[in-house]
């Protein structure tokens, strides 16, 4: 089975029901099914199945059409960020070695001399097949390639199977209480897998998605006022944007949130401005998928928790010896489910660190109480979640250490009401911080640029000679680095 397998049924029984609504068009299921089939045939025509495509496109129907069409044809799609710098693009393309690149016409200046076959958005209509004849695949092939990072700070490509996401779709139905009648607003970029998943899961279940081509609080509220929205996928930046504008809404809508955990002050403000709304927070990762969910009626009494496990997930919390710990005791969180990723592309060594038999771990430190509520106490990999985007300190640290005069550098995530977390850089060396920031602007995506900069005379170190992240964090929180 494929993530696109249900489209034909909806085209037959709900042919006039909108599948996708944007500020520019409405696409009913009958048209959506036809577009996906013709697009799949176009991919198949290139070189058959089990190939890879890199997509560099803005939010909209065309992106979803190409992603779904590639999935239907047995291809795997890498979702590229149009904000990536040249080096970031090259690193990722070298890893996945795509058979085809499809990019926005605004990127012709970059891709026009690419050795990989490239199609631009203004050429799609000519490329698209008029018929939908192609060999159907069985859904066992990977369909999605994303990027995460490990201790080296270098991006690693991870792969997802159709079956893992289809199993996740069951969580939407059972744990998030979603039906085929949903009207789901997708306000964020498909670069973030939260929003891509939100769109594709809704289409699989037969609902209608409303896609913002570009986010703004005003546009989100316009869609809430003008359409029968029942669910909204959000990350902390979107929530804070709504709060900053002071919007008030009494619609019965549910907000589904991932990313950095909401601060209690943010939750309180949301309940004042959206008094009849429901809130769902879920915890997971690129490798693990869904792990826990904190439902609306649990938000106050268990505010510090990430919730209880989804109905199709098992967890185990273990000490350094691999032994399961007792209730309330800290340990490394292990997860068992059918939603786990397939592994890292061409990186068996790193895959084995995550996938361990039937279990998997990203080395988050957790504990569980007697009622089954899970608490995440820290991340062994120190990942920062900035506005729903995953940022890995090691990647930024590597850039900082290449700058002349930098002797030592460390990057941390610090709590922020708007972003959830923001990036802070601590530098030892005879350098100009404005010059160092300009250097980062030339070598990192804009969202990875540190928002807080501090120079340090000396760092605290561990016995192994590494900078002690916990001690630096304590210094900062006590105002010792101001």
Q: What is each PLM-predicted segment?
A:
Residues 16-47, 54, 58-60, 85-90, ...:
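Conserved AMP-binding/adenylate-forming core of the ANL superfamily
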Residues 28-30, 143-167:
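Conserved AMP-binding A3 loop
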Residues 25, 42-83, 188-189, 390:
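Conserved AMP-binding/adenylate-forming
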Residues 101, 337, 342-343, 365-448, ...:
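AMP-binding/adenylate-forming catalytic core of the ANL superfamily
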